[in-house]
UniProtKB/Swiss-Prot annotation:
One of its GO terms (cellular component) is cytosolic small ribosomal subunit. The lineage of its organism: Bacteria, Pseudomonadati, Chlorobiota, Chlorobiia, Chlorobiales. Belongs to the universal ribosomal protein uS2 family. The keyword Oxidoreductase does not apply. The gene is rpsB. GO terms for biological process: translation. PANTHER family: 30S RIBOSOMAL PROTEIN S2 PROKARYOTIC AND ORGANELLAR (PTHR12534), SMALL RIBOSOMAL SUBUNIT PROTEIN US2M (PTHR12534:SF0). This is Small ribosomal subunit protein uS2. It comes from the Bacteria. Pfam families: Ribosomal_S2. NCBIfam families: rpsB_bact (TIGR01011). Signal peptide: none annotated.
Length: 251
């Protein structure tokens, strides 16, 4: 599991919050001071809470369940897509489509439609339709891919959400809370920490801050999955060894 160090967070600007006049009073326990009208986040608390969150994410990843990455703001979308893909997790980086969680079966129908268009391109169907129809299907597929591509392989609801900017992703937070799906999130000083289960007080606007946090989450998931595979291999080897011992005894 990755571990956050205060020095790394300082270099990434994780401690810079929003203007003090835009703060959410519920973030007071996580604020170190106000400087030049800007709130400074207490990185000791960030490190403690972030490491607690990573430990919980590690436990989820070891069960084989999926953790959905969510971040559609300009500074986060590329990072979210890259790190979620690297850790083989579903993600939403373009736009949260209402019902992505609460109306998941309907969303799955749209994904099946996208896959159907892909099959048309390879099974000869495209050769039997007009150029205009092919163009329309291509545009439909492109639109679906842009919005749903990150969850195209997700066959069931995720076990948890990891979110960058809970104010912007309020729809995702609301749907997760409705379904009882735990939410892990970077929470800036202008946001309500009570909306999420695992608060990581952090600058959710700076690219380096987002990169540091999202990469650590992805690293934790990857390491947890690798450990799970290693444990399964060792368990299989132990079983084979026991069976071999039984055969030796019977002989």
């Amino acid at each position: 599991m990755s571990h956050f160090q205060v020095e790394d967070m300082l270099r990434a600007g994780v401690h810079f919050g929003h203007l003090a006049r835009r703060w959410c009073p519920k973030m007071k326990p996580y604020i170190f001071m106000e400087k030049n009208g800007v709130h400074i986040i207490d990185l000791q608390k960030t490190a403690e809470l972030a490491n607690t969150a990573l430990k919980a994410l590690e436990a989820i990843a070891q069960t084989g369940r999926e953790i959905m990455f969510v971040g559609t703001k300009k500074q986060a979308k590329v990072i979210i897509a890259e790190q979620a893909t690297r850790s083989n997790m579903p993600y939403v980086s373009e736009r949260w489509l209402g019902g992505m969680l609460t109306n998941f079966q309907t969303i799955r129908q749209s994904i099946r439609r996208m896959n159907s268009i892909d099959r048309m391109a390879t099974d000869g169907t495209y050769d039997m339709i007009t150029k205009k129809e092919r163009l329309m299907l291509g545009r439909e597929r492109e639109k679906l891919m842009r919005i749903l591509g990150g969850i195209a392989t997700m066959n069931r609801l995720p076990a948890a959400l990891f979110v960058v900017d809970i104010k912007k992703e309020h729809l995702a937070i609301k749907e997760a809370r409705t379904l009882g799906i735990p939410v892990f999130a970077m929470v800036d000083t202008n946001c309500d920490p009570e909306l999420v289960d695992y608060v990581i007080p952090a600058n959710d606007d700076a690219i380096r801050s987002i990169q540091l946090m999202v990469k650590a989450v992805a690293d934790t998931i990857i390491n947890a999955r690798e450990l799970k595979v290693e444990q399964e291999v060792l368990a299989t080897m132990d079983e084979a060894e026991v069976e071999g011992d039984k055969e030796d005894i019977s002989e």
